[in-house]
Amino acid sequence: MFTVFLLVVLATTVVSFTSDRASDGRKDAASGLIALTIKGCCSYPPCFATNSDYCG
């Protein structure tokens, strides 16, 4: 019974680890899209005036 418990814990850990690594790529893509959107906003004066704290 203890062996089954260890196998379940190991399987859960492996699935969780690989799922987290897969989602990291999606997070990177989303942050890149947000950065491009903010850069576009910084070059547009009305948007820059409203969101100047995001523009470097």
UniProtKB/Swiss-Prot annotation:
The keyword Zinc does not apply. The modification Cysteine amide is found at C55. It is found in: Secreted. Residues 43-45 are annotated as: Ser-Xaa-Pro motif, crucial for potent interaction with nAChR. Keywords: Acetylcholine receptor inhibiting toxin, Amidation, Disulfide bond, Ion channel impairing toxin, Neurotoxin, Postsynaptic neurotoxin, Secreted, Signal, Toxin. GO terms for molecular function: acetylcholine receptor inhibitor activity; ion channel regulator activity; toxin activity. PROSITE patterns: ALPHA_CONOTOXIN (PS60014). Expressed by the venom duct. Residues 1-16 form the signal peptide. Disulfide bonds join C41-C47, C42-C55. It holds the Pfam family Toxin_8. Residues 17-39 form a propeptide. The keyword Thylakoid does not apply. One of its GO terms (cellular component) is extracellular region. It comes from the Eukaryota. Its main location: secreted. Alpha-conotoxins act on postsynaptic membranes, they bind to the nicotinic acetylcholine receptors (nAChR) and thus inhibit them. This toxin blocks mammalian nAChR alpha-3/beta-4 subunits. Belongs to the conotoxin A superfamily. The cysteine framework is I (CC-C-C). Alpha4/7 pattern. This is Alpha-conotoxin AuIA.
